[in-house]
Structure formats: structure tokens, C-alpha cells
Design a protein with these regions (language model features):
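Membrane-lumen/periplasm interface segments of specific transmembrane helices
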Residues: 123-126, 167, 311-337
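Multi-pass, polyprenyl lipid-linked donor-dependent membrane glycosyltransferases
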Residues: 184-188, 208, 215, 227-254
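Active-site lumenal/periplasmic loops and adjacent helix-entry segments of GT-C-fold
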Residues: 116-213, 232-234
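Membrane-interface alpha helices of multi-pass inner-membrane proteins
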Residues: 60-63, 268-284, 288-295, 333
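Membrane-interfacial entry segments at the cytosolic side of transmembrane helices
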Residues: 68-74, 96-108, 208-212, 264-267, ...
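Membrane-embedded, hydrophobic transmembrane alpha-helices
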Residues: 1-98
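Perimembrane helix-loop-helix junctions
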Residues: 83-85, 89-91, 102, 289-318
Length: 337
């Protein structure tokens, strides 16, 4: 019982480190590229997913020359912490619940319940094949060696070019007896649950709010099932795929229902295009969904923003997809695998 409690506490500490790293990394991108008028809670949640995407790109580039080691973790952590320190005042103002209302208490209580639920679930036994041990050898190869040409000839699954294994390998280097893939699956689920809960509290009560409440209630139900399902404690890409897909659905819904101004529409488009490209690198079967998300976000732009968006796609899509394609070619030893 004590061992289980300590493992749950350690999982929460690992989650805090990951959340700080990704949110801070996303903040740099947010400040330099997206340039919102202010940092809000919603912006901070967006920054986490942006930071995840940027970290996946970095890990692919790093893996061309080095194994996924403690130095890779340190660089991402340093990037995140430095951004959090540089923007400390704005972040403090964004996360402070002022004025504190009764509904905030309900949200915090619900969130803590889900934290305990997910931490308990990720301690479960790892299952067989695609939902469990399937990915563990891949993670270990990435931890020990840089990308190995033709590794897929040793075993077919080693050629599967899915970036979550780089993410899990990175987390294995955080000082912990908790396997990295467990911490990785848990933090993605927890952040998304928190984002849904706090967005419901922060939204204005109007027709759009009612639609948003229904839609996010559906997403929350799916996430609860996901947190208790097969992939919560598995070394496979499905949990990351599901969480990022839900986040994209959330941003598209926000774009269509809340009718933001043109500047905010363009900001959402940049986020959707970056994360949609990352979704393809997680699992190529998500390509159609990713394309639909990008087209929907682009269609809602007008005039000059549409022209700018085409330029941003030409610049950013290769940044995400080219390292992934090259990584896959090297791993498999074939141009097409």
C-alpha cells in the first residue's frame, strides 16, 4: 500500500515537471509567433499542447545524432522553466482564481478526483501486444542509441515511425522508478481534463456556452473512459493520438461556435496546423482527420489572413513532417515501408 502511494506521488511530481516543460516551451512559441494580446488560462493550456508538438520535433532532430538521454530532457526542461520564470507575473495573474467562486471549488474538487483516478489507473498491470509490451523494446532502443539505419529489418515493429516512443524514451530519463510511458499517458489525459473543466467555468453563459457545455461534456465522458481503458498504462501511441485529436476538436469547435475576431482565428489556425501535422507523425492513419481540421480552420479565415496562412503552412509543415519522414526512411531502410 505504501509503495502504491509513493508511486502515485512520484507520478504527480513527474507530471508537474512535464507540464512546466511543455507549457514553458509553448510560451516561447506563443510569444514569438502567435503574439496574443494577453496570457490567459486558455492560452496556457494551448501552450502545453504546442510545447508537446515542439518537443516531439526536437526529439526527432536530436535522435539523428544522439540517443534520447538525460541531456535531451534537460534541454526541454530548461526551455520550459526559463519561459515560466520570464513570464512569472503574467502566468500568476492568469492562474489566480479571482474572484474565487463556489463553482471554482467544484472544479478543483472534480479535478483532484480525476488526478487520483488516473494515477491509480496508470499503476495497473501492462497488458500484452499492441496495448502493452509491444512498444517497450522500441523505447529501449531509442534510449540506448541514435537512429539506427535499417533497424526495422531486425524486427518489423522497430520500423514503425511513431514519435510517441521518442516521448516515452525521454520520460524514462526522468529520475524515477515509474516507467516513462505511464507518466506520459497520464499527464496528457489530466491536462485535457483540466482544460475542459476550466474552460467551462471561464466561458460566458450564452447560447454558445450551452453548446460548448454539451460538446465538452461528451469529450469529458470519452476521456473518463479513456483514463480507465486499455491504453492508460500502455507503451503505445493511442493515448497521445486520442488526447491530441480531442484537443483539435475542441479548438475547431471554439472556432466555429464562439466566432472569435480575425486575429484570434489566425492564432487558432496556426495552432491547428502545427498540431495536425504532429498528429500525422503520431500515427499516419490520422492523416485524413488532420487534413479536415486544417481545411476547416483555413476556410474560416478571410482576406489577408488566408494568404498568410498558406505561407505559414509552407514553412511549418516541412518543419514537422520532413524530420519524421527522414527518421522513418532511416529506421526502415526503405523509401516506403
Amino acid at each position: 500500500m505504501i509503495e502504491l502511494f509513493l508511486a502515485m506521488v512520484e507520478a504527480m511530481i513527474a507530471w508537474i515537471l512535464i507540464a512546466v516543460s511543455f507549457t514553458g516551451t509553448g510560451l516561447w512559441f506563443n510569444k514569438l509567433v502567435l503574439k496574443p494580446s494577453e496570457i490567459t488560462r486558455s492560452v496556457l493550456f494551448d501552450c502545453f499542447w504546442i510545447g508537446l508538438s515542439l518537443s516531439l520535433i526536437f526529439l526527432q532532430l536530436w535522435h539523428f545524432l544522439f540517443s534520447i538521454n538525460i541531456f535531451a530532457v534537460s534541454i526541454i526542461l530548461l526551455s520550459g522553466v526559463s519561459a515560466m520564470i520570464a513570464n512569472f507575473k503574467e502566468i500568476s495573474a492568469a492562474i489566480t482564481l479571482k474572484p474565487f467562486q463556489k463553482k471554482h471549488l467544484y472544479v478543483l474538487a472534480s479535478f483532484m478526483f480525476f488526478v487520483l483516478l488516473v494515477t491509480n489507473r496508470i499503476m495497473g498491470a501492462v497488458l500484452d501486444l499492441d496495448t502493452g509490451y509491444f512498444g517497450l523494446p522500441i523505447i529501449e532502443w531509442y534510449r540506448q542509441y541514435p537512429v539506427i539505419p535499417g533497424l526495422g529489418n531486425l524486427q518489423t515493429c522497430f520500423a514503425f515511425n511513431q514519435v510517441p516512443y521518442l516521448f516515452f524514451a525521454m520520460l524514462e530519463n526522468i529520475p524515477s522508478f515509474l516507467p516513462g510511458f505511464r507518466a506520459g499517458n497520464g499527464i496528457l489525459t489530466i491536462v485535457l481534463i483540466a482544460q475542459i473543466l476550466f474552460n467551462l467555468v471561464d466561458s460566458k453563459e450564452n447560447r454558445a456556452y450551452k453548446l460548448k457545455s454539451i460538446f465538452q461534456g461528451i469529450l469529458l465522458t470519452f476521456l473518463i473512459v479513456e483514463s480507465l481503458g486499455l491504453f492508460a498504462n500502455a507503451a503505445c501511441p493511442e493515448n497521445m493520438l486520442h488526447c491530441l485529436s480531442i484537443f483539435l476538436a475542441f479548438k475547431i469547435f471554439e472556432l466555429l461556435v464562439e466566432s472569435p475576431d480575425e486575429k484570434e482565428k489566425y492564432r487558432i489556425f496556426l495552432i491547428v496546423s502545427l498540431l495536425s501535422a504532429s498528429l500525422v507523425t503520431i500515427k499516419i492513419s490520422a492523416a485524413i482527420y488532420a487534413i479536415v481540421c486544417v481545411i476547416t480552420a483555413w476556410y474560416n479565415l478571410a482576406g489577408e489572413s488566408r494568404k498568410k496562412s498558406v505561407y505559414s503552412l509552407l514553412v511549418r509543415l516541412p518543419l514537422v513532417l520532413v524530420p519524421w519522414i527522414v527518421h522513418g526512411v532511416i529506421l526502415s531502410g526503405y523509401l516506403l515501408f
